[in-house]
C-alpha cells in the first residue's frame, strides 16, 4: 500500500469524450444542395472539384490512371494518398486492392453510392493526435442518408461540346424502415461514357502516337495534323 510515483501515460485514440468547442478545427461541410449543383456523376468527379484536393487519380481510362482504372481517391493538399483518412459515417474503410501509380494504397471512394450521399465533411488540418498517422493531411468523412424511405430514381445525360462523346447515368435509391430504430437503404447505379479520341482536340493531337511508338502527326516539328514527307529508311 505504499505510494509509488508512476510515469505519465498518454492515451491517443478515437471517440474521446470532450466538448466540441475545445479547439477550433477548419471543417468544410458540403451539403446535399451543394453536391447537386456540382453536377457530378460520381464521388470521383465530386472530389476532383475540391480545391483542397490535388494529386488524385480519378481518370477512368487505363492510359492516364494505370492500375487504378475505375477507382477514385482523395488526396488533401497533395500530401499523398496515404496521408488522407477517408471515413464513411465516421468509420474507417478497407484499403482498395488497386495500387496507385506511385505505389501508394488508398480507400476506393468509387464504392460509395453517389445517390445515397447526404453530405461530406472535410477536416483540412492534420488530425494525427486523434486518428493516427494516416490523417496527416486531414480527414474526409462521407455521410450517407440513414433515414430515407421510398424510391428515388435519377437519370442524367451529358454531351461534350464539338464531339460525339456522351455520358448517360441512371441511379436508383430505395429505403424502408424495419421497426422503430432500423432503416434499410439499397442503392444501385449505372454509368456509360463513350470514348473521345485525342485527335478531336488540338492540345492532345500533338501527343497522338502510332503503334510504332512515335507520332505521325508532328514529325519534324510541324504543326499537328499537317502531312509530312518521309524519306529514307531512318523511320520505321
PLM feature spans:
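Periplasm-facing N-terminal accessory domains of Gram-negative outer-membrane beta-barrel systems
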Residues: 1-8
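N-terminal periplasmic "start-of-domain" segments of outer-membrane beta-barrel proteins
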Residues: 9-38, 44, 96-101, 151
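Short loop/turn motifs at secondary-structure junctions and domain boundaries
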Residues: 21, 75-78
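Surface-exposed loop and edge beta-strand positions of immunoglobulin-like domains
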Residues: 33-36, 77, 110
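Surface-exposed beta-strand-turn/loop segments characteristic
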Residues: 45-51, 55-67, 71, 79, ...
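Short aromatic-centered micro-motifs
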Residues: 86
Amino acid at each position: 500500500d505504499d505510494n509509488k510515483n508512476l510515469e505519465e501515460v498518454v492515451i491517443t485514440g478515437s471517440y474521446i469524450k470532450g466538448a466540441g468547442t475545445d479547439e477550433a478545427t477548419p471543417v468544410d461541410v458540403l451539403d446535399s444542395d451543394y453536391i447537386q449543383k456540382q453536377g457530378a456523376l460520381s464521388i470521383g468527379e465530386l472530389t476532383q472539384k475540391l480545391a483542397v484536393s490535388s494529386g488524385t487519380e480519378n481518370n477512368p481510362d487505363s492510359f492516364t490512371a494505370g492500375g487504378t482504372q475505375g477507382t477514385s481517391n482523395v488526396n488533401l493538399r497533395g500530401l499523398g494518398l496515404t496521408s488522407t483518412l477517408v471515413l464513411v459515417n465516421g468509420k474507417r474503410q478497407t484499403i482498395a486492392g488497386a495500387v496507385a501509380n506511385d505505389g501508394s494504397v488508398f480507400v476506393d471512394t468509387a464504392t460509395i453510392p453517389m445517390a445515397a450521399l447526404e453530405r461530406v465533411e472535410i477536416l483540412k488540418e492534420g488530425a494525427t493526435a486523434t486518428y493516427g498517422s494516416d490523417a496527416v493531411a486531414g480527414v474526409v468523412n462521407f455521410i450517407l442518408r440513414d433515414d430515407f424511405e421510398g424510391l428515388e430514381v435519377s437519370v442524367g445525360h451529358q454531351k461534350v461540346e464539338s464531339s460525339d462523346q456522351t455520358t448517360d447515368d441512371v441511379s436508383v435509391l430505395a429505403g424502408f424502415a424495419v421497426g422503430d430504430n432500423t432503416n434499410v437503404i439499397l442503392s444501385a447505379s449505372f454509368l456509360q461514357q463513350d470514348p473521345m479520341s485525342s485527335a478531336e482536340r488540338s492540345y492532345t493531337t500533338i501527343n497522338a502516337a502510332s503503334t510504332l511508338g512515335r507520332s505521325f502527326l508532328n514529325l519534324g516539328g510541324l504543326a499537328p495534323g499537317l502531312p509530312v514527307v518521309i524519306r529514307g529508311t531512318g523511320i520505321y
